[in-house]
Each structure stands twice: as structure tokens, then as C-alpha cells.
């Protein structure tokens, strides 16, 4: 028996149309602000083999894979003939591919495309304590404590580790303008001889900056908060130097031998602290004290799942025997 439906008193519910206020800002589907990434852009120090466009060897510097340059939206000096994907004209950088010492299925050398910054100007907005990295897996296993020389791995055996320090950095041009998206600070994982000299010069720069500021402002101070230091422009000077435990085990290392010195007359050119637009953004990053601890937790979780890195992780030759393990594109992208 078919039941006849009564439509007489049935009203169809109509969708409610909501009009935005006249001055409302509409969502821009094509805006770069919609870009996001779970990866932390990163770079590493390389001690030699860098050449200019004419093939001349030009020393040591900080190398970034082009994948990471895209993540942080590094600025470009492109010509009219370049397309949007061009990575040959990254501002303040020299193109340099890193040889992985591996070959692909066709027998061709696997080269990671990237670029080097030789004379950086930077805001160091984060500095971790010394961290321990497993020599076997490359994962971070904790904070170094005086007296540590080994740690217990997933198999219960004691393993050797290397010490590293991580920095969160915003790179600037000569006019102290950011060279990349400042919502994407870049992580530098420093190890071996590079770490020791870089950190020593960073601390020396900070004390020199305090002295210059106090002389100029006629104030007395022996130390400043991290937020204050993060707004001072550190411009380290690099050179390539042979380092190693013995003459037969030496290789080229990136050594920080100095920095642009702040004085009471020029300190303002090496500071963004009075730039209101920059202050709040830099301070937000500085107040994020947990950034390096999160990477430790992430590495510990991975080390429980796999004792050794996957085969598709790319390894690169390090500066010396103390610097044994470095991830390729994947680890550089995730800041490990």
C-alpha cells in the first residue's frame, strides 16, 4: 500500500546566506600566507670545495639545500629571463652542489643542489646547550653533562656520541633586512671544530656588543637577556683550515676566526632592536625555549622504532673524524 505524502504544510528549510562586513578581509586562495611546512629549514657548515662561477675555490661557508631555501622562501636576485622555480640567484648566496659520494641507478653521481653563504649576517635567536648525537644512528639522545662519554642505546649497549649545538637563525642583508621569511627561522646544527670556534666567537661578539652599547649609552651592564642579544647582528668570518686528531687524519673544516666588531660608533648598524616591526617577531621566537627539546623527543621516539636510519637517508662526508654523521635532504629539512 502506497502512502501518499502530504506537502501542504511542509516548508523546505532554506540555507542561511551570511554576507561579510563591507570592510572584511576576504580569504586569498593564492596568497603565500597559506603556505605551511612541518619541516624546519636548516643548513650546515662546509669546510672546502666551494667554487665561484669561474671555478675558483673561494673558501668555507654555510651550505643550504635548495629544498630548504624554498621552505624558508629565501629571497632572489633573478633576471627577467628566470622562471619562478629558479634557484641560481638566491640573494647573497653562491650555488654549490654537495656530492653524496653515491651513484643513482644509471651510475650518475648523486649531487644535492644547494647554495653557500660565505659572509653571513645573522640574528641568533636561539642557542641550545651541548647536545649528544649517536654516532651510530645520527639521532639526538640528550643534553651533554660533564663526565659523559657514552650512552646506552636501544639494544642496551653503550654507544659513542658526538657533541653538537643547535642555533635558530634569521639571516639579514647589508641593510639588516631579512633574506628570508622571518616566520621560518633556520636551524644550524654545529659540531666538531666548527662548533667550538663558532660558539666561542658568538660569545665574544655578545660581550663586545654589550661593551659598545654601554660606552655609547653611558650605562653599566655585564650581561643582557636573550631577547636583547637576539636583536644584535652577528657577522662571523669564515676560513677553510685543515683540522683533525693527527696529520694523517685531517680534512678541511669551516673555522670562525673573527667577526665584524661593534663599537660605540657603529653599534646601531649591527642592531635591529629599535625596529618596532621586528621587535615583537624576534621576541616571539626567543621566548620559544622548547624548540631544541622537541627535536630530542622526536629523535628518541624514532630511535625506538629503528636502530639505524633508513637506507634512503643521504649521507655526506663530514669535515673531520669528529663529525661522522650528517643527514642529507631529509634530515636537513627536519632540522635533525
Swiss-Prot record:
The name this protein goes by in its record: Uncharacterized protein 254L
Pfam family, one: DUF5895
Region (Disordered): 297-336
Record's compositionally biased regions (Basic and acidic residues): 297-316
InterPro entries: DUF5895
Amino acid at each position: 500500500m502506497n502512502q501518499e505524502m502530504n506537502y501542504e504544510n511542509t516548508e523546505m528549510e532554506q540555507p542561511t546566506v551570511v554576507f561579510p562586513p563591507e570592510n572584511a578581509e576576504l580569504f586569498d586562495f593564492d596568497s603565500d600566507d597559506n603556505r605551511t611546512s612541518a619541516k624546519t629549514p636548516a643548513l650546515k657548515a662546509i669546510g672546502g670545495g666551494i667554487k665561484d662561477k669561474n671555478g675558483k675555490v673561494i673558501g668555507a661557508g654555510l651550505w643550504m639545500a635548495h629544498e630548504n631555501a624554498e621552505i624558508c622562501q629565501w629571497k632572489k636576485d633573478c633576471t627577467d629571463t628566470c622562471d619562478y622555480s629558479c634557484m641560481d640567484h638566491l640573494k647573497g648566496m653562491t650555488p654549490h652542489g654537495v656530492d653524496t659520494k653515491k651513484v643513482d641507478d644509471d651510475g650518475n653521481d648523486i649531487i644535492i643542489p644547494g647554495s653557500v653563504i660565505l659572509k653571513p649576517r645573522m640574528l641568533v635567536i636561539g642557542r641550545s646547550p651541548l647536545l649528544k648525537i649517536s654516532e651510530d644512528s645520527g639521532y639526538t639522545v640528550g643534553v651533554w653533562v660533564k663526565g659523559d662519554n657514552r650512552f646506552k642505546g636501544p639494544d642496551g649497549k653503550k654507544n659513542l656520541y658526538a657533541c653538537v649545538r643547535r642555533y635558530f637563525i634569521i639571516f639579514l642583508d647589508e641593510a639588516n633586512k631579512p633574506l628570508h621569511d622571518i616566520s621560518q627561522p633556520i636551524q644550524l646544527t654545529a659540531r666538531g671544530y666548527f662548533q667550538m670556534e663558532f660558539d666561542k666567537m658568538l660569545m665574544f661578539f655578545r660581550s663586545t656588543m654589550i661593551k659598545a652599547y654601554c660606552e655609547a649609552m653611558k650605562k653599566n651592564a655585564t650581561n643582557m637577556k636573550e631577547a636583547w642579544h637576539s636583536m644584535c647582528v652577528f657577522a662571523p668570518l669564515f676560513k677553510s683550515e685543515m683540522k683533525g686528531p693527527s696529520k694523517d687524519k685531517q680534512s678541511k673544516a669551516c673555522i670562525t676566526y673573527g667577526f665584524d666588531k661593534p663599537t660605540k660608533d657603529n653599534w646601531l648598524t649591527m642592531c635591529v632592536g629599535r625596529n618596532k616591526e621586528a621587535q615583537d617577531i624576534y621576541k616571539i621566537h626567543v621566548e620559544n625555549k622548547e624548540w631544541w627539546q622537541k627535536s630530542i623527543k622526536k629523535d628518541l621516539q624514532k630511535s625506538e622504532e629503528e636502530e639505524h636510519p633508513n637506507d634512503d637517508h643521504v649521507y655526506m662526508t663530514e669535515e673531520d673524524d669528529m663529525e661522522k654523521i650528517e643527514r642529507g635532504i631529509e634530515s636537513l629539512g627536519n632540522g635533525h
